[in-house]
UniProtKB/Swiss-Prot annotation:
<feature type="binding site">
    <location>
        <position position="91"/>
    </location>
    <ligand>
        <name>Mg(2+) 1</name>
    </ligand>
</feature>
<keyword id="KW-0057">Aromatic amino acid biosynthesis</keyword>
<dbReference type="GO" id="GO:0000287">
    <property type="term" value="F:magnesium ion binding"/>
</dbReference>
<dbReference type="Pfam" id="PF02885">
    <property type="entry name" value="Glycos_trans_3N"/>
</dbReference>
<feature type="binding site">
    <location>
        <position position="225"/>
    </location>
    <ligand>
        <name>Mg(2+) 1</name>
    </ligand>
</feature>
<feature type="binding site">
    <location>
        <position position="79"/>
    </location>
    <ligand>
        <name>5-phospho-alpha-D-ribose 1-diphosphate</name>
    </ligand>
</feature>
<keyword id="KW-0479">Metal-binding</keyword>
<dbReference type="GO" id="GO:0005829">
    <property type="term" value="C:cytosol"/>
</dbReference>
<dbReference type="Pfam" id="PF00591">
    <property type="entry name" value="Glycos_transf_3"/>
</dbReference>
<dbReference type="GO" id="GO:0000162">
    <property type="term" value="P:L-tryptophan biosynthetic process"/>
</dbReference>
<feature type="binding site">
    <location>
        <begin position="82"/>
        <end position="83"/>
    </location>
    <ligand>
        <name>5-phospho-alpha-D-ribose 1-diphosphate</name>
    </ligand>
</feature>
<feature type="binding site">
    <location>
        <position position="87"/>
    </location>
    <ligand>
        <name>5-phospho-alpha-D-ribose 1-diphosphate</name>
    </ligand>
</feature>
<feature type="binding site">
    <location>
        <position position="224"/>
    </location>
    <ligand>
        <name>Mg(2+) 2</name>
    </ligand>
</feature>
<feature type="binding site">
    <location>
        <position position="225"/>
    </location>
    <ligand>
        <name>Mg(2+) 2</name>
    </ligand>
</feature>
<feature type="binding site">
    <location>
        <begin position="89"/>
        <end position="92"/>
    </location>
    <ligand>
        <name>5-phospho-alpha-D-ribose 1-diphosphate</name>
    </ligand>
</feature>
<keyword id="KW-0822">Tryptophan biosynthesis</keyword>
<keyword id="KW-0028">Amino-acid biosynthesis</keyword>
């Protein structure tokens, strides 16, 4: 442990096993808050590696009581956060579009850390439970093609670091690992990163964690989602191959909008935006979701191209299928609360 800490301070990279050892001590409460803060800041100053991100992700997954291998291919779509854009909950809304298009989605998310409203905040406002059991998650995936896994609920170990993350108020290695720690085995994934320098690192980490196919994207204007503002950079991960690409909204029939057209607000405001999108109301919000869901459908192999993915996403919304997935999740949540 001391050797690994010394390496971090000296700005030397850790192996997967070394980083796992460090954070096993952190999660066992053998490290003070000030020491943990120093570790996180030192890692950030050094620059986190794919091996370190993958190793920490594995530690968190190994401690989760929600580890699940579903009988069908599963995907997740999630951004790292940290872009300070105050955009609405794009990936949360897109998740229902994916499910409506026939993709099984284990949506992993949290409350707000460095943004105004997190996925858990907006879903809770809509009436979705944040405390499903492992068996209930499996049932929802089976019957409704989408389940929500609240990070603080499915990862008890994160409670040990929550206060420090909140106090620091800056993106740390935990922002990178958030999308990678889903306790449900994922076959494919769509990940947004706020930092273009992190594209390769996060893509490699996803590869190390066994994703068969993934897209890691950095949006125009610094979004951790695909943006309608201009050209977006992404990496396609497919087995042992990493391929750098770009995508512009006009290439898939979507108009250009500045990022300030997709500003969000508090949980109530974002819930209303989400509902307006799933009801198909024309706006920059809708087109942003079509863009991101389209890319995710391509990542999942449900669509042969991003253009086809956008059209499939549009059909998911216009048919009412996407909205029905949300309504089913709310209904299931009510039944669960009545039993309790």
């Amino acid at each position: 442990m001391k050797h690994s800490l010394h390496k971090i301070i000296e700005r030397q990279d850790l192996s997967t096993e070394e980083i796992k050892e460090v954070f096993k001590h952190c999660f066992s409460q053998e490290v003070s808050d000030s020491e943990l803060a120093a570790i996180l800041i030192s890692l950030k100053m050094k620059g986190e590696t794919a091996e370190e991100v993958a190793g920490l992700s594995q530690v968190i997954q190994e401690h989760s009581p929600f580890l699940l291998n579903f009988h069908q291919p599963v995907m997740d779509n999630c951004g790292t956060g940290g872009d300070r854009s105050n955009s609405f909950n794009i990936s949360t809304c897109s998740a229902f579009v994916l499910a409506g298009a026939g993709v099984t989605v284990a949506k992993h998310g949290n409350r707000s850390v460095s943004s105004q409203t997190g996925s858990a905040d907006v879903l809770e406002k809509l009436g979705v439970s944040l405390a499903f059991t492992k068996e209930q998650v499996n049932e929802m995936l089976d019957k409704n093609q989408i389940a929500f896994l609240f990070a603080q609920h499915v990862h008890p170990t994160l409670k040990q670091v929550g206060k420090v993350r909140k106090d620091l108020r800056i993106p740390t290695i935990f922002n990178f690992i958030g999308p990678l720690t889903n306790p449900v085995h994922l076959d494919s994934q769509y990940i947004g990163v706020y930092d273009p320098e992190a594209l390769q690192m996060v893509a490699k980490a996803a590869q190390l964690l066994g994703r068969e196919r993934a897209i890691v994207i950095h949006g125009a204007g610094g979004l951790d989602e695909a943006s309608l503002q201009g050209e977006n950079k992404y990496i396609l991960v497919e087995n042992d191959r990493l391929e750098e690409k770009t995508i512009h909204p006009e290439e898939v029939g979507l108009s250009v909008y500045p990022n300030d057209e997709i500003q969000g607000g508090n949980a109530t405001e974002n819930a209303n935006i989400l509902l307006s999108v799933l009801k198909g109301e024309d706006s920059a919000y809708l087109d942003t979701v079509l863009f991101n869901a389209g890319i995710a459908l391509f990542a999942s192999k449900k669509a042969d191209s991003i253009y086809d993915g956008v059209e499939l996403a549009r059909e998911s919304i216009t048919s009412g299928s996407a909205l029905s997935k949300l309504n089913n999740l709310i209904t299931f949540s009510k039944k669960v609360s009545e039993v309790v």
